[in-house]
């Protein structure tokens, strides 16, 4: 699908945002079960567009619709390059980018792309910490287990301050705690309205516990089933 046509049509129809997934490769042989079914991985997962190139095309033909990754596979990317990609996309879209992040579920893919699958959320957290330094500091540096670099310049900076919103994807056991610690929102995958309601209560408690503004952590539901009656139940 043309990434210039679809976003423009979505904006004309009044949609709030458009999201691009990421899987740069899909192993021919994989022992990682597909999360939605626990079984075979759909063949479409080997045909995803590149999200940042697609969103750049979308930015060029739109002016209002928000542009988002749902999600960026952070352990598979170099944060020094990713920081620039996000900043430039946010700049040229006049602050419309939403940075949805995830750690991945396919062991073989993550490993081939240089990620540490068994500790992928720790690696993701470090990368996001490094990205925030690069986005907000004139001279940025980071020293961690997975990423370690001396002071560097990384310009331009994002339009959104202090940086584009960082939304954590998935339904991992500790995802809400992670959102409260170093995220700006949650991207639940295939969640029911009841689960969303209960999770909102937990997020509100975590906001208070960590001194964050009430209601500052967002929830954006994605990856839902094609049941057309389902969206009504969220309203």
Model-predicted regions and their roles:
Residues 1-234:
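Active-site-adjacent structural elements that line small-molecule/cofactor binding pockets in enzymes
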């Amino acid at each position: 699908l043309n990434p210039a046509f679809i976003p423009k049509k979505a904006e004309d129809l009044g949609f709030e945002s458009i999201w691009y997934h990421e899987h740069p490769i899909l192993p021919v042989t994989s022992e990682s079960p597909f999360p939605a079914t626990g079984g075979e991985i759909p063949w479409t997962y080997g045909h995803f567009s590149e999200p940042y190139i697609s969103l750049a095309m979308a930015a060029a033909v739109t002016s209002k619709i928000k542009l988002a990754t749902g999600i960026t596979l952070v352990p598979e990317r170099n944060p020094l390059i990713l920081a620039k990609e996000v900043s430039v996309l946010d700049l040229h879209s006049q602050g419309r980018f939403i940075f949805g992040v995830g750690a991945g579920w396919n062991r073989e893919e993550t490993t081939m792309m240089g990620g540490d699958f068994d500790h992928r959320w720790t690696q993701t957290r470090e990368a996001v910490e490094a990205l925030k330094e690069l986005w907000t500091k004139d001279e940025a540096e980071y020293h961690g287990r997975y990423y370690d670099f001396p002071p560097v310049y990384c310009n331009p900076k994002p339009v959104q301050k202090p940086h584009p919103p960082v939304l954590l994807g998935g339904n991992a056991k500790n995802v809400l705690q992670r959102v409260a610690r170093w995220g700006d929102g949650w991207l639940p995958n295939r969640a029911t309205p009841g689960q969303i309601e209960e999770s909102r209560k937990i997020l509100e408690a975590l906001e208070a516990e960590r001194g964050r503004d009430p209601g500052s952590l967002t929830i954006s539901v994605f990856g839902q089933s094609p049941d057309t009656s389902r969206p009504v139940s969220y309203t």
